[in-house]
């Protein structure tokens, strides 16, 4: 059987400039990000790994599904939080009973914060040049 036939649910997550497309497959709890194991891709950073696994752990499903993720754009922080949102959305597709738990843990909330653009006449987005009275 091909992986397309086994796929239980899809979810897309976004954060900053990162986009993560998440697929859930029945399995033992393995997480692959861009064809690499999650801990290798996330450089063994425990906070990123915890963010990725948190929707599964809050439902107690950490060893029920294999997670296959394709991510693009941004850095590891944005990608890991985009994966978290995509995974939570995919889990909601599997069973609607998961939705209230995920919502109460804020896994279904899209974090809209992004870098503010630089304005002309300023050094950065809000940093103005030094004021001189005379």
Curated annotation (Swiss-Prot):
Gene: rps9
Secretion signal, residue range per the UniProt entry: none
Species whose genome carries this gene: Cyanophora paradoxa
Entry keywords, A to Z: Cyanelle, Plastid, Ribonucleoprotein, Ribosomal protein
Highest rank taxon of the organism: Eukaryota
One of the GO biological process terms: translation
Claim: tRNA-binding is one of the keywords in the record: no
Ranges for region Disordered: 105-134
Protein name, as recorded: Small ribosomal subunit protein uS9c
Gene Ontology CC terms: cyanelle; cytosolic small ribosomal subunit
Family, similarity comment: Belongs to the universal ribosomal protein uS9 family.
Compositionally biased tracts (Basic residues): 115-134
One Gene Ontology term of the molecular function aspect: RNA binding
Ranges of biased composition (kind: Basic and acidic residues): 105-114
Principal location class: plastid
């Amino acid at each position: 059987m091909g992986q397309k036939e086994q796929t239980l649910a899809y979810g897309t997550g976004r954060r900053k400039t990162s986009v993560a497309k998440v697929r859930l497959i029945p399995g033992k709890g393995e997480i692959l990000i861009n064809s690499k194991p999650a801990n290798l891709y996330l450089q063994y950073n425990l906070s990123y790994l915890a963010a990725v696994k948190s929707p599964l752990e809050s439902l107690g499903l950490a060893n029920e599904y294999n997670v296959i993720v394709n991510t693009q754009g941004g850095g590891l922080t944005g990608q890991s939080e985009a994966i978290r949102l995509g995974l939570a959305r995919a889990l909601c597709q599997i069973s609607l009973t998961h939705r209230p738990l995920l919502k109460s843990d804020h896994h279904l909330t899209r974090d809209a914060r992004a870098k503010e653009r630089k304005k002309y006449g300023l050094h950065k987005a809000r940093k103005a040049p030094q004021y001189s009275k005379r």
